[in-house]
C-alpha cells in the first residue's frame, strides 16, 4: 500500500503528479470553526512558487489554490478540507528522451523496480512539485496553531549553507531572510552565494545546501513516549522532503564531540534554560524552548553534465537532463521545511489535547 498521508489527528494526504492536470491535498482532522480562506493559504504558496529568481527553476506556475471542501462561510466545518492547484506550465516534451532511460540520482529506477511503470514527465509523483501541497497544508496548520495557541507562534526557516559555504551564526538576522532570494539570514553571505550559484548554473551543474527551521511560542508537553516522540516525527517529516539526506534536532551530530556537562542545558527556576543544545525537545517531549531542526539536501540530480546510466532494457547510455531545474533545490525547500514543521506541531497539539486536555 502506498503512503501518501502523514499525521495522526491532523492528517494530510497529497495527490497528483508534476505534469498532470492538477495537484492537491486533503486535510482531515482540522477542528471546526477556525476562520480559513484562500487568502490565508496563498501568501505561503507565493513564497515557494517557482520562477521568482534566476536561482530557481524557470517553470512558471501561478500556484493559485482553490478550497474545494471543508470550509463554509469562511469557517472550517470539521469535515475534510480539500485543496487543489492546477498545473499550467508543463513541458512534457522536454522529458521524451528519458522515457526509457534512468536519470542517475533520481527516483526513476526505484519507481520502475517497485511498480513496473513510471510517469517520466518531470519525475511524476516523485517531483518536488508535490511539495506545493505540503505548503498549502502547512498554511492551514499555521491557522490552527495561531488560533489554539496564540499569535506568538512563529515558524521560520533559513538557508544556512550552500556547497560547504556556511553562514556566520553571529550575524543571524531573521529580517534578512525575507530580503534576499536565497532565504539567507546572513547578509554578508548572500553575495558570495549568488556568485557561486551563477557559476554552478553556467556549468550546467547543481549544488547541495543546509536548511534550519525554528518554531517558537509552542507550549511544553507536545510529543509522547516512546513511539510518538516529537523529534522522531519531525525528523521523519523533514526526511520526507525531496532530496533531504540527513536531519538533525538541536545540535545534532555536533553533540557527539561534547562532554556531558557541555551538552546539558542548565535549568533555573521559571523554568529557565541556560542553553538549547536539545533543540527544545527532551525525551521526545517539547520543553517550551524553541524547537530546532536542521537538514542537508543533496544537489539537484537534473544536470546538463552527461552521466553514465542504463535503459529499461539494461543497455548502457549517457543521460543529460533537459528541462527547467533548480541549481540548488535547498532554496525552495525553505518554505517546505516551515510547512512540515507546522503540520507536525498541529498534529501533536491535537494529540496532546486528546490525552491531557488544555488545563496543564
Curated annotation (Swiss-Prot):
GO terms for biological process: amino acid biosynthetic process; aromatic amino acid family biosynthetic process; chorismate biosynthetic process. Belongs to the chorismate synthase family. It comes from the Bacteria. Homotetramer. This is Chorismate synthase. The lineage of its organism: Bacteria, Pseudomonadati, Pseudomonadota, Alphaproteobacteria, Acetobacterales. Its cofactor is FMNH2. GO terms for cellular component: cytosol. GO terms for molecular function: chorismate synthase activity; FMN binding. Pathway: Metabolic intermediate biosynthesis; chorismate biosynthesis; chorismate from D-erythrose 4-phosphate and phosphoenolpyruvate: step 7/7. The keyword RNA-binding does not apply. Gene3D superfamilies: Chorismate synthase AroC (3.60.150.10). It comes from Gluconobacter oxydans (strain 621H) (Gluconobacter suboxydans). This reaction introduces a second double bond into the aromatic ring system. NADP(+) binds at residues 48, 54. Its EC number is 4.2.3.5. Reduced FMN (FMNH(2)). The gene is aroC. FMN binds at residues 125-127, 242-243, 283, 298-302, 324. Keywords: Amino-acid biosynthesis, Aromatic amino acid biosynthesis, FAD, Flavoprotein, FMN, Lyase, NADP. The keyword NADP applies. It catalyses: 5-O-(1-carboxyvinyl)-3-phosphoshikimate = chorismate + phosphate.
Amino acid at each position: 500500500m502506498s503512503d501518501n498521508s502523514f499525521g495522526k489527528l491532523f492528517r494530510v494526504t497529497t495527490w497528483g503528479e508534476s505534469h498532470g492536470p492538477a495537484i492537491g491535498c486533503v486535510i482531515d482532522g482540522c477542528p471546526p470553526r477556525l476562520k480559513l480562506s484562500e487568502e490565508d493559504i496563498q501568501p505561503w504558496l507565493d513564497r515557494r512558487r517557482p520562477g521568482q529568481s534566476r536561482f530557481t527553476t524557470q517553470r512558471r506556475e501561478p500556484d493559485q489554490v482553490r478550497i474545494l471542501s471543508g470550509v463554509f462561510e469562511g469557517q472550517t466545518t470539521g469535515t475534510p478540507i480539500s485543496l487543489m492547484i492546477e498545473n499550467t506550465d508543463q513541458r512534457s516534451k522536454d522529458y521524451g528522451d528519458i522515457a526509457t532511460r534512468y536519470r542517475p540520482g533520481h527516483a526513476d529506477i526505484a519507481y520502475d523496480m517497485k511498480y513496473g511503470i513510471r510517469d517520466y514527465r518531470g519525475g511524476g509523483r516523485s517531483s518536488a512539485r508535490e511539495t506545493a501541497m505540503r505548503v498549502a497544508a502547512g498554511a492551514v496548520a499555521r491557522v490552527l496553531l495561531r488560533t489554539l495557541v496564540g499569535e506568538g507562534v512563529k515558524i521560520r526557516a533559513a538557508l544556512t549553507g550552500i556547497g560547504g559555504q556556511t553562514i556566520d551564526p553571529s550575524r543571524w538576522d531573521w529580517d534578512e531572510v525575507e530580503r534576499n532570494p536565497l532565504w539567507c539570514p546572513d547578509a554578508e553571505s548572500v553575495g558570495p552565494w549568488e556568485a557561486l550559484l551563477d557559476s554552478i548554473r553556467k556549468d550546467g551543474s547543481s549544488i547541495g545546501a543546509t536548511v534550519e527551521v525554528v518554531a517558537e511560542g509552542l507550549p511544553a508537553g507536545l510529543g509522547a513516549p516512546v513511539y510518538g516522540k516529537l523529534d522522531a516525527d519531525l525528523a521523519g517529516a523533514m526526511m520526507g522532503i525531496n532530496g533531504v539526506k540527513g536531519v538533525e534536532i538541536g545540535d545534532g551530530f555536533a553533540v557527539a564531540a561534547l562532554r556531558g556537562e557541555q551538552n546539558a542545558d542548565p535549568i533555573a527556576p521559571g523554568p529557565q534554560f541556560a542553553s538549547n543544545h536539545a533543540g527544545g525537545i527532551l525525551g521526545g517531549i517539547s520543553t517550551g524552548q524553541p524547537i530546532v531542526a536542521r537538514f542537508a539536501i543533496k544537489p539537484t540530480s537534473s544536470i546538463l553534465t552527461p552521466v553514465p546510466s542504463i535503459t529499461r532494457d539494461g543497455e548502457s547510455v549517457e543521460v543529460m537532463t533537459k528541462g527547467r531545474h533548480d541549481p540548488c533545490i535547498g532554496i525552495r525547500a525553505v518554505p517546505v521545511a516551515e510547512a512540515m514543521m507546522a503540520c507536525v506541531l498541529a498534529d501533536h497539539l491535537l494529540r496532546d489535547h486528546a490525552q491531557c486536555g488544555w488545563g496543564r
